[in-house]
């Protein structure tokens, strides 16, 4: 019996020991799992800095790879030891609503409609950065401060009107907008506010558009082109950025209001439209009442995207008919005249220009090819054909400084002048360069783009203000200057736009520096208490100001400047296409 009692006690002791050891094991096991979870969390936050390109499929971490867009940058990133550099996920960082000491405002703001900072950055790219670049951070914040200044001036003195007269502190109305209460600045600037993460100010714009914007407020004749690129383009971009469905409704309202302008025998729209009466007309000065190439050729991005998001094929059909007519029309030397008859679909006159009257048509050909995810072969073929003709007939080199520039043609005769508007061409050729098939052509076209960008830069630095004129000439007394006529500045963005593309597509910091110089010049010579003005004469700042703050100053100039100093993933050129008013719409992937 004693033996039995002893065995029972021993078993009890052993059982107790076993339970104790089991608890100890569980405790340390839990601690180990917790530690492992921390380690995994550290990996997820990006502490692994590199990854073998050949074994990338084995990695589970969802880091953002630094994506270089030019051939040279891609080679530099991938070719060294077959390693990609990884950018850590932004897990520990502050949410977009919080500001560092260098960021102007915003306080007490609500969430953007995109719901979360993670969702926002997934959609449009990095808003905040873990790899700090102090110089360009400060530049970017300065541009943001300029945007705030411009917006506050408009809000205080012209809210709900087209634009602001910043010196007079009164609303400005142009007849292109269809009446004084079409809020061009609000719709044009809203996506810039969103991209800059200015939540309070974006919400002001958003709420106004949702509750007040209506084409029924168009009480006079409007420009079909300007309404498309500013209002329709702005609304489409806002939908693409935020995914808020009311923007589709507003955009469709604009698109439907514009349809009567297309009711011509050829399908080519007229320039002007009275929305109430549905009466369309052309300008009398346009070669006797013809339609204008830059206007009819710069509707495709917007109408195509509107059809896709609204499931309304009518809009795409309208611009496809325009494209077909342009492709069919006879073109001397492969070049497009600035004027076309909307009844016959035939070009009239022989004035060709990459500046006013022609410009954005060419831009939209290559951008339509990109927007289609490189499937729109009609746009591709039309663009490459006319690009060859432009290079043959409309590109010249100056005798004095060997500056490459574009000319206008009139009856086959070259006019040796280049407009500020034509300085979008470097960006256009840069897009062409990265889509060329051979390395030789990539280099040749990119070199052309850079030479043209240099000429546009010369037009800026040869003025006293370091701001370029409306038009600059190449002759015995002028070279990239315009000291005798057309020497004002009305806040045009094309020069900045071209440098933005070249920064993104070549990675050369020189273009960032050029943009920054222009930003500083605008700040110095154009800023007033309630916004920004133009200049009467860029060679003589004492000559006076242009008392208008254009809606495109907020939509284009400040947006392109901001993006030049931002992370390259923010509105990536791989995923987005800018319309000619700098409103981004997505590349269509299905």
UniProtKB/Swiss-Prot annotation:
It is a single-pass type II membrane protein. Its main location: membrane. Pathway: Protein modification; protein glycosylation. One of its GO terms (biological process) is ERAD pathway. The active site is at residue 470. It is found in: Membrane. InterPro entries: 6hp_glycosidase-like_sf, Glyco_hydro_47, Glycosyl_Hydrolase_47, Seven-hairpin_glycosidases. Its EC number is 3.2.1.113. Glycans are attached at residues 156, 212, 373, 402. This is Mannosyl-oligosaccharide 1,2-alpha-mannosidase mans-2. The gene is mans-2.
